[in-house]
Amino acid sequence: MLNEQKCEACSIDAIALSKEEQQSLLLQLSDWQIIERDEIPQLEKVYKFKNFKQAWAFSNKIAELAEDEFHHPSILLEWGKVTITWWSHSIKGLHKNDFICASKCDALAIEE
C-alpha cells in the first residue's frame, strides 16, 4: 500500500512519472485528481470538515507529515475545507512521492 511506503530523495535529475504511471497510481487513491497548473501536473484533493478548527487541525497534521517525509505540498486552509496539492517541484511534475504522501493524507483524514 502506498501509505506504508516512505518518500525517497527526489533530485533534479529524477524522472517524472509517465501519464500511464500516474493513472495507475491514481487508481490506488480515493477522490484525488490530477490537474495542471502552468503546464505542471499536480495531484489535488479537497477535504471537508465541520468547522474551521477541524480543518486547521488537519492542516497541522499535513504539515507534520510533510516535515517527516521532507516533501511539502501546497495547503489551502479555508472554513470547513482544506485543499492539498502535491507535486515535485524539482522535476516540475509528479513523482511516486506525491502519491505516497497523498495516500498518507487520506490515512490522516480517517483519524479526524
Curated annotation (Swiss-Prot):
TM helices/strands, residue ranges: none
SUPFAM superfamilies found in the cross-reference section: PCD-like (SSF55248)
Calcium is among the record's keywords: no
Domain of life: Bacteria
Enzyme superclass (EC): lyase
Annotated CDD domains: PCD_DCoH_subfamily_a
Family: Belongs to the pterin-4-alpha-carbinolamine dehydratase family.
Protein name: Putative pterin-4-alpha-carbinolamine dehydratase
Source species: Vibrio campbellii (strain ATCC BAA-1116)
